[in-house]
Regions:
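Conserved class I S-adenosyl-L-methionine
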Residues: 37-69
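Core SAM-dependent methyltransferase catalytic element
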Residues: 98-100, 115-136
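Short catalytic micro-motifs in class I SAM-dependent methyltransferases
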Residues: 13-14
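Short alpha-helix
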Residues: 82-99, 105-106
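Short conserved loop adjoining the S-adenosyl-L-methionine
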Residues: 1-3
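A conserved beta-strand element that flanks and buttresses the S-adenosyl-L-methionine
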Residues: 10
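A short glycine-rich, Lys/Arg-flanked "PGG" loop and its adjoining helix->strand segment in the class I
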Residues: 22-37
Length: 136
């Protein structure tokens, strides 16, 4: 996409999976119009052990994957640089350096997304970052 194409960019539960999250943020900001808004809902999933399902309901989303698959997911996750970052502090610092300002952050979004412990429940606390691209 050309520079400054979009008014809003929204991402949910994606950033933590990217091999180069800073590069993705840079690209998102490039295609965002000056004054445009970036909304990112994510979590510090890298800090959690996916193979530990003790706190999850019996019918959680990953129940059918099995222990081997969950261990493989854990090994892949450990290879992602973002898994070692302190988030969302890293996100805010990175976005600030790339030209995002006027931040708001919501650390309580999980309680509104996961209102009950059902098959979609995830105990990792989500965060929501909203920021505006500098108007230049």
């Amino acid at each position: 996409f050309p520079d400054g194409t979009f008014d809003v960019i929204v991402s949910r539960n994606l950033t933590w999976t990217l091999p180069d999250a800073a590069r993705a943020y840079k690209e998102w900001i490039r295609v965002l119009k000056p004054g445009g808004v970036l909304i990112n809902a994510d979590a510090n999933y890298g800090a959690d052990d996916f193979s530990d399902t003790a706190d999850l309901p019996a019918n959680h989303a990953h129940f059918k994957l099995g222990d081997d698959m969950m261990q493989e997911c854990e090994e892949i996750k450990r290879q992602l640089p973002i898994s070692s970052y302190v988030r969302p502090a890293w996100d805010l610092e990175t976005l600030g350096k790339l030209g995002i300002s006027r931040f708001s952050i919501d650390l309580g979004i999980s309680s509104r997304v996961y209102t009950k412990k059902d098959e979609f429940y995830n105990p990792t606390p989500m965060f929501l970052i909203c920021g505006e691209k500098n108007k230049k």
